[in-house]
Amino acid sequence: MQMDNRLPPKKVPGFCSFRYGLSFLVHCCNVIITAQRACLNLTMVVMVNSTDPHGLPNTSTKKLLDNIKNPMYNWSPDIQGIILSSTSYGVIIIQVPVGYFSGIYSTKKMIGFALCLSSVLSLLIPPAAGIGVAWVVVCRAVQGAAQGIVATAQFEIYVKWAPPLERGRLTSMSTSGFLLGPFIVLLVTGVICESLGWPMVFYIFGACGCAVCLLWFVLFYDDPKDHPCISISEKEYITSSLVQQVSSSRQSLPIKAILKSLPVWAISTGSFTFFWSHNIMTLYTPMFINSMLHVNIKENGFLSSLPYLFAWICGNLAGQLSDFFLTRNILSVIAVRKLFTAAGFLLPAIFGVCLPYLSSTFYSIVIFLILAGATGSFCLGGVFINGLDIAPRYFGFIKACSTLTGMIGGLIASTLTGLILKQDPESAWFKTFILMAAINVTGLIFYLIVATAEIQDWAKEKQHTRL
């Protein structure tokens, strides 16, 4: 904790400061791209000219079928699956390249242009659907790549903008936007479809994205030293706190050292574990509610949105508490990271395993479902920002690699869960949550043993070797 003692004793503003304002701006970017990605999942119900027996049929949908504001398309379930998954391909392909280039090129330009592209493509989805399926797939794939740029490149921001004792708060504030976006989509998409037609969903979220993009180019700067509006005291506070970590010199990426680093593998394993449980809770919560509670579609949508809201709250709480423990010297950095990672892995496992045994009580199922889906966001104060501790110079690349590993875990989890539900419906939920708990515990054990918060040798400045 020697680095903490180097921080300037002069107290600077917190939530009224520019660094927190920029973190909130990134939060808005994340809300937008998540909303643009998730809205098609719901609008697909009223875009197709057939009713999926496992989907969302109801009387309001029948009314929408007769509304000229909602064009209908004869897309088979297979075509719908291709369209819905096309975004993921773009995100996966772009991860590692963005992680590399975000440490070289301007983060402001990368995120700004990517957000603009994603928003413009959102505006083009309705006309693309009228032209043909191929155009929708292309738009969604490119949009996924653009959203992947925003989601990955943003972590490079905190290398120069986040003081060590404020990393938890700043990163959790911004990344919690990924959780608030789906909550907003679940609340407003149905209303927009009923009143204005499904194309307006894409137009509204696309227009909001363009507006946020303009704010981004005006307000954000890659380095606090270059920002014309930041106060001198805040600028000195940030630069002084990061003087031991941030350097303007650019060294080649030590790929071999990164691949051999056990702390990096601990972070990647943690990401794999998090996305495994997160994807299960995200994709299968509506199905679980339908099978256990037998509610109508409107109630299902409302109940499905609650875990996102509480996850947003838990994520921000994790950031506040993690920095509180560090600021008061209650715990070391690695103790804080392991504590919140343990909470983010164990609590969803415990609440998830209890869910299949609560079939007779409505409120207990809802409460445990919310807790199982929300408490995983405690990882925002743990493994999610651990890469910034061990290798701030290469945080963007490490975050990209760990996110890619996590997305693979999420893909395996969603596919395997689908097979379990199909082959053994009676005990499927028990098997699903037991497997999720086993993955969470295994991933946590590995992380607790291997993880560290010390800057790795391969991530340190090597300027003396050039003299």
Swiss-Prot record:
Primary location recorded for the protein, binned into one broad class: membrane
Pfam families with a match to the protein in the record: MFS_1
Family of this protein: Belongs to the major facilitator superfamily. Sodium/anion cotransporter family.
Topology of this chain in the membrane: Multi-pass membrane protein
Expressed in which tissues: Expressed in kidney cortex, liver and brain but not in other tissues.
Gene Ontology CC annotation, any one: membrane
InterPro entries named in the record: MFS, MFS_dom, MFS_Na/Anion_cotransporter, MFS_trans_sf, Pi_cotranspt
GO molecular function: sodium:phosphate symporter activity; transmembrane transporter activity
Species, as recorded: Homo sapiens
Lineage per the UniProt record: Eukaryota, Metazoa, Chordata, Craniata, Vertebrata
Domain of life: Eukaryota
Quaternary state and interactors: Interacts with PDZK1.
Glycan attachment positions: 41, 49, 58
Reactions mediated catalytically: 3 Na(+)(out) + phosphate(out) = 3 Na(+)(in) + phosphate(in); urate(out) = urate(in)
Function: Important for the resorption of phosphate by the kidney. May be involved in actively transporting phosphate into cells via Na(+) cotransport in the renal brush border membrane. Plays a role in urate transport in the kidney.
Compartment(s) where it occurs, according to its Swiss-Prot or TrEMBL record: Apical cell membrane
Keywords from the UniProt entry: Cell membrane, Glycoprotein, Ion transport, Membrane, Sodium, Sodium transport, Symport, Transmembrane, Transmembrane helix, Transport
Transmembrane parts of this sequence: 81-101, 119-139, 178-198, 200-220, 257-277, 301-321, 339-359, 365-385, 401-421, 433-453
One of the protein's GO biological processes: monoatomic ion transport
Protein name stated in the entry: Sodium-dependent phosphate transport protein 1
